[in-house]
């Protein structure tokens, strides 16, 4: 299981991304419609004032149960280990063992 601090850091990043999403879109739109280079540079300076962790690219997908960053299944929000265990226990509706 991942350290509690790593899980907490990731949830904090998710909150920051949601908080600043509208502001980031506004800045990007202003940059796109800017008429002069100076205007673009001044808008970019304002844009750089936003928190670094408010960018979506800094997010890392983690398992909701264990916090594991690798082997993550987007559809379920779980790592492969937890997904397998929950599927065997019948806790995931519509998921069953493959047979061909």
Swiss-Prot record:
Q: Would you say which domain of life the source belongs to?
A: Eukaryota
> Under which name does UniProt file this protein?
Small ribosomal subunit protein uS14c
Where does it reside? Plastid, Chloroplast
Give the main location: plastid
What is the role of the protein in this entry? Binds 16S rRNA, required for the assembly of 30S particles.
The UniProt record lists the keyword Kinase: no
Q: Name one GO biological process term.
A: translation
Keywords from the UniProt entry: Chloroplast, Plastid, Ribonucleoprotein, Ribosomal protein, RNA-binding, rRNA-binding
How is this protein organized at the quaternary level? Part of the 30S ribosomal subunit.
User: What GO cellular-component annotations does this UniProt entry give?
Assistant: chloroplast; small ribosomal subunit
Give the residue range of the signal peptide: none
- GO MF assignments: rRNA binding; structural constituent of ribosome
| Native organism | Ostreococcus tauri
Give the protein family.
Belongs to the universal ribosomal protein uS14 family.
């Amino acid at each position: 299981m991942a350290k509690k601090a790593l899980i907490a850091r990731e949830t904090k990043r998710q909150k920051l991304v949601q908080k600043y999403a509208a502001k980031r879109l506004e800045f990007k739109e202003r940059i796109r419609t800017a008429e002069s280079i100076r205007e673009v540079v001044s808008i970019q300076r304002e844009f750089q004032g936003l928190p670094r962790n408010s960018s979506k690219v800094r997010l890392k997908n983690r398992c909701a149960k264990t916090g594991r960053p690798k082997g993550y299944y987007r559809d379920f929000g779980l790592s492969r280990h937890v997904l397998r265990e929950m599927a065997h226990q019948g806790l995931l509706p519509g998921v069953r063992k493959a047979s061909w």
